[in-house]
Amino acid sequence: MVTVLDAIANAPRLRHPEKAHKPDQEVLRKPDWIRVKAPVSKGYAETREIVKSHKLVTVCEEAGCPNIGECWEKKHATFMIMGEICTRACAFCNVATGIPTALDPDEPARVAHAVKQMGLSHVVITSVDRDDLADGGAQHFADVIRAIRAATPSTTIEILTPDFLRKDGALEIVVAARPDVFNHNLETVPSNYLKVRPGARYFHSIRLLQRVKELDPSIFTKSGIMVGLGEERNEILQLMDDLRSANVDFMTIGQYLQPSKKHHPVIRFVTPEEFKSFETIGRTKGFLLVASSPLTRSSHHAGDDFARLRAAREAQLQKSV
């Protein structure tokens, strides 16, 4: 006999249960400058096969990144560790929310093997938020970094981390593993936090980035925001100043794209000209590098940007001699 419990047990899992009760938001039509081609290349298919064969998760897929076709064609992928379920529910994010599973102790080795198989000279590792773990997943991040170093020592490593909010000693564990780039995104201006990023605290994120530099000045620090969420221009400029006060080296700015009708709406599409002006202003404020365009994302062109970062630092050091 089939009961209502059987129906519930077999029902598909809601990707965003916390958003199910929210009213639908209009999804604005994208302007021409945001259109991208569907991913159909041979390189894309090969990258997808490597990811699946190692049972790995990528933020490219989970977050619905518009650049997935371009990046995967070039065998570039951003690996998302610690599962595919996040303990937070940011209004902009397409990653699934809920109760995550236990950490997989074999994941560091599988990520390292995939990095070696793909021949990556630069790799980006990110994660879901794991507020359920005592260290927020810091030791797992460190284990992944060290596994990659052991498997392919020449590969440079960039990490995009959560904020490890209220996890004493977590940041120190990650920094001790010595990633080449430490990225932690502010995501938006502080006035938007309660509605866009309610589980985080703006000035905690600023302090985290500052603390990375205090612990190891040789590590490049990086942070990014989305625009089109209702922020004012002067708020973006103040955010730039806040990042520079924390000695952040690299800033990324991209257009927010609404994943579904249940997510925060796009308030407006920022023009390419405005993005260019943010890049110019950011450079005058002292960032070593600013990437600002409608399709800019944290790990888009990360390898090329790392080379530019190193060159910019060397040029800066030469000037100070």
Swiss-Prot record:
| Residues at which [4Fe-4S] cluster 1 binds | C60, C65, C71, S299
Give the CC-aspect GO terms: cytoplasm
Q: Which cofactor does it need?
A: [4Fe-4S] cluster
Single Gene Ontology MF annotation: lipoate synthase activity
- Which pathway does it operate in? Protein modification; protein lipoylation via endogenous pathway; protein N(6)-(lipoyl)lysine from octanoyl-[acyl-carrier-protein]: step 2/2
- Domain of life, per UniProt, equals Bacteria
Q: Where does [4Fe-4S] cluster 2 bind?
A: C86, C90, C93
Q: What InterPro entries does the annotation carry?
A: Aldolase_TIM, Elp3/MiaA/NifB-like_rSAM, LIAS_N, Lipoyl_synth, rSAM
List the Pfam families: LIAS_N, Radical_SAM
Indicate whether Hydrolase appears among the record's keywords.
Answer: no
Family assignment from sequence similarity: Belongs to the radical SAM superfamily. Lipoyl synthase family.
**Designated name of the protein:** Lipoyl synthase
User: Organism, per UniProt?
Assistant: Mesorhizobium japonicum (strain LMG 29417 / CECT 9101 / MAFF 303099) (Mesorhizobium loti (strain MAFF 303099))
